[in-house]
Amino acid sequence: MTKGTQSFGMRHNKSHTICRRCGKRSFHIQKSTCACCGYPAAKTRSYNWGAKAKRRRTTGTGRMSYLKKVHRSFKNGFRAGKPTSAATA
């Protein structure tokens, strides 16, 4: 048997499994670290050379249920509470 392409077909064991943080099949079983998000590290793995990867998982790619409302509050000067009586009259 040669040591190149032919021998890759003989492989059966999985080196990576599903990561519980990012959900990708990037969690290395023996190292017990995720190649995608860096789990179990506290901070998410991200590098400047991976600008495209950053774009995929940065703020604005999800629901942003709170941040969507911030723009409207900013327009009104972050005023809270009921309007004054002068405004209603």
Curated annotation (Swiss-Prot):
Primary localization class, coarse: cytoplasm
Domain of life: Eukaryota
Cell compartments where the protein resides: Cytoplasm
Entry's cofactor comment: Binds 1 zinc ion per subunit.
SUPFAM superfamilies: Zn-binding ribosomal proteins
GO CC annotation terms, alphabetical: cytosol; cytosolic large ribosomal subunit
Keyword set, alphabetical order: Cytoplasm, Metal-binding, Ribonucleoprotein, Ribosomal protein, RNA-binding, rRNA-binding, Zinc, Zinc-finger
Amino acids binding Zn(2+): C19, C22, C34, C37
Keyword match Amino-acid biosynthesis: no
Ranges annotated as C4-type zinc finger: 19-37
Reported cofactor(s): Zn(2+)
GO molecular function, one term: structural constituent of ribosome
Keyword Transit peptide among UniProt keywords: no
UniProt-listed InterPro entries: Ribosomal_eL37, Ribosomal_eL37/eL43, Ribosomal_eL37_CS, Ribosomal_zn-bd
PROSITE patterns in UniProt: RIBOSOMAL_L37E
GO BP: any one term: cytoplasmic translation
Purpose: Component of the ribosome, a large ribonucleoprotein complex responsible for the synthesis of proteins in the cell. The small ribosomal subunit (SSU) binds messenger RNAs (mRNAs) and translates the encoded message by selecting cognate aminoacyl-transfer RNA (tRNA) molecules. The large subunit (LSU) contains the ribosomal catalytic site termed the peptidyl transferase center (PTC), which catalyzes the formation of peptide bonds, thereby polymerizing the amino acids delivered by tRNAs into a polypeptide chain.
Similarity comment text for this entry: Belongs to the eukaryotic ribosomal protein eL37 family.
Subunit structure: Component of the large ribosomal subunit (LSU). Mature yeast ribosomes consist of a small (40S) and a large (60S) subunit. The 40S small subunit contains 1 molecule of ribosomal RNA (18S rRNA) and at least 33 different proteins. The large 60S subunit contains 3 rRNA molecules (25S, 5.8S and 5S rRNA) and at least 46 different proteins.
Misc. comment: There are 2 genes for eL37 in S.pombe.
Protein name: Large ribosomal subunit protein eL37A
Organism: Schizosaccharomyces pombe (strain 972 / ATCC 24843)
Gene: rpl3703
